[in-house]
């Protein structure tokens, strides 16, 4: 599984950073540790003497965490963020993005630039493409947010697939401007498999002639318009950002 922490670990390695302050649950820093990067948390020795502050999923974040992060940045650490999305969909409905709120507080105090490692970062899309051994234009990005997944796909020339089981409904997708409009609107995640299955038959032709992808997408968009008629709303859980 590839997560924002996977991209963060790769980024920190490329930057030559050996030690990071992690604002997040214990699992947030695991990918960093697996990559040989030492992680520390608020209250531990040397928490403000690090090369990077990495902000991830941290529901229990307190003012001491924010203060420690700010001190580390004032000491020269760079700011790395897993997600800058203000809201996302869960079983309970719309939920705030903790890392977005935490990062906003840190940046308000420090005015530090940030490096985003999750969606819609082109860095994340590039990492996935490299891991899979394919160009970014061969990827499909699936999601429920026009300013996250669709924007990410557009930045890398990938196919953007929208679902209506999260924060954006079918009618809202149709009203999006061209820059945030998906290539296809799917009622639920299970339809992704059939979409990819249909597209897979054309894979050799697309691989041989990359420039024909736009024509292929237009054809798929027309076919998907019929399959994506509004359906009764279903409550579903999407993978967290």
Walk through the language-model features, giving the residues of each:
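Asp-based, Mg2+/Mn2+-dependent phosphohydrolase catalytic module
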Residues: 2, 6-224, 229-241
């Amino acid at each position: 599984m590839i997560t924002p922490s996977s991209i963060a670990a790769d980024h920190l390695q490329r930057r030559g950073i050996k030690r990071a302050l992690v604002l997040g649950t214990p699992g947030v820093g695991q990918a960093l540790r697996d990559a040989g990067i030492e992680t520390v948390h608020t209250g531990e020795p040397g928490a403000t003497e690090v090369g990077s502050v990495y902000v991830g999923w941290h529901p229990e974040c307190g003012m001491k965490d924010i203060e420690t992060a700010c001190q580390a940045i004032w000491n020269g650490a760079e700011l790395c963020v897993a997600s800058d999305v203000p809201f996302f969909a869960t079983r309970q409905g719309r939920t705030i993005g903790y890392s977005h709120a935490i990062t906003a507080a840190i940046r308000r105090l420090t005015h530090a630039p940030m490096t985003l490692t999750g969606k819609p970062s082109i860095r994340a899309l590039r990492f996935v493409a490299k891991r899979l051994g394919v160009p970014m234009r061969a990827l499909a990005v699936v999601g429920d947010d026009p300013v996250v997944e669709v924007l990410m796909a557009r930045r890398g020339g990938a196919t953007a697939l929208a679902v209506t089981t999260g924060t954006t409904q079918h009618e809202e997708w149709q009203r999006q401007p061209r820059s945030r409009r998906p290539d296809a609107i799917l009622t639920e995640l299970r339809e992704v498999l059939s979409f990819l299955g249909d597209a897979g038959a054309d894979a050799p032709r697309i691989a041989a002639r990359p420039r024909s992808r736009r024509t292929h997408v237009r054809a798929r968009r027309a076919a998907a318009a019929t399959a994506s008629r509004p359906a009764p709303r279903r409550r579903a859980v999407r993978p967290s950002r």
